[in-house]
Amino acid sequence: MSNKTICIDIDGTLVHYEEWKGEEHFGGIIEGASSATHKLHENGWYIIIYSTRANKELISRFLDDSKIEFDSINENPNQPENAKDGKPYADIYVDDRAICFNGDWEQTLMEIEKFKPWEMEGIENKNEQLSN
């Protein structure tokens, strides 16, 4: 068993994401995602795929077909029984729609106001270039 646990989101983190197109649609794999999950496993990480997607069978099949390594989906079986409802425990969470809290709520509120997922910034930049 691993000492380190990581939760990784799917959309916008492992695969490209612009908008929801249904549970059976997954964007293309982001370059480096597969090799990163392999390296994490080699380095002893327990990988939880953590997503708002609910169909674990579809997720598992897609990840297997895409050669994305993982240990579980939306749950950490290593958590105590009384802590299994809700967010899985992990040492690190990787998500395209997260802000790292640094203890300063004033700074965090400013970051929330200006926040855009990384792929949305690219789309806005392309649209801006097209309109010029």
Residue ranges and their predicted role:
Residues 1-132:
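HAD-like aspartate-dependent phosphatase fold
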